[in-house]
């Protein structure tokens, strides 16, 4: 049962959305997250060499967390159950790559069984999805989002470090077949890398009747190689697509929605723009993140993490954990500072935080 007092912060924002990372590991090496391939190094090296005063960044040291530090399914279920009791109703399972977590369909089933969870989704790169899809659907997964940054096999491999385009495309088809609607597909747009594919990706969304999201490149890569010049602003993407397609604005009834959306004139599919760099949506943010090792993050770009694992493993009561969650949320940052002089990139990459 939802408590009378909402889980709110000091700015009046009420939390409804919990992102749950189940692993910090990933089988891709995406250029915007874990750029550990030679092709990624070459891409960024060329960008830094072009600067008048190049200052190569110091990469974040990546160390996978040992299994003993990762929350068990029972611990994850407990946190979600308590969060739902405080008003959370949307849960998204993330990673790393969540399908690398052995028995993930068991966890999905447990989360689906929590009264009050009205939207249970997963974000995946799609590479392993065909092996797990039916079990996930039967367990209660309602929606799924895939990453698809390129439709060109060579460019796809350059971006992700894997020769996996065919697998991801097959996963998208399978998700539609299983009724995991609406199937969402995300593309991180990086200038000089895949911005020439914007129209092709949008046309793919229209033909496949997908909900496609173009996302601005964010400073969450382990190479600390993010540069503002590599960001393609959302307005630029929209302008380019409006010149090619008949797009019609979609009005949202949810002020906390991160994407500005447009439908295609023929009624098949839609595109959305997620622009955290050029058009931050912090003022309506209603999201929390639970990392795989049991930390709560109140902002994707926060430098502070709040440990729940110690409470979970230290015998804390439900009431104690609920009280701690309220304290954490009350301290939620007003906004991020990307692009400002005081911005400091988090010490964890997107793969470790959970998208």
Describe the function of each predicted region.
Residues 1-18, 203-207, 217-220, 224-355:
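Auxiliary Fe-S-binding modules of radical SAM enzymes
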Residues 28, 153-154, 280, 306:
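Glycine-centered loop/turn positions within well-structured domains
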Residues 57-71, 75-94, 315-335:
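Short Fe-S-cluster ligation motifs
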Residues 41-42, 62, 152-159, 221-225, ...:
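A short acidic, helix-capping loop that chelates divalent metal ions and anchors anionic groups
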Residues 11-73:
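Canonical Radical SAM [4Fe-4S] cluster-binding loop centered on the CxxxCxxC motif
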Residues 29, 33, 154, 159, ...:
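Residues that scaffold the ATP/ADP-binding catalytic core of kinase and kinase-like folds
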Residues 70-93, 100-215:
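Radical SAM/AdoMet-radical enzyme domain recognition
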Residues 98, 188-192, 219-222, 227:
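Short histidine/acidic/glycine/proline-rich micro-motifs that form metal-
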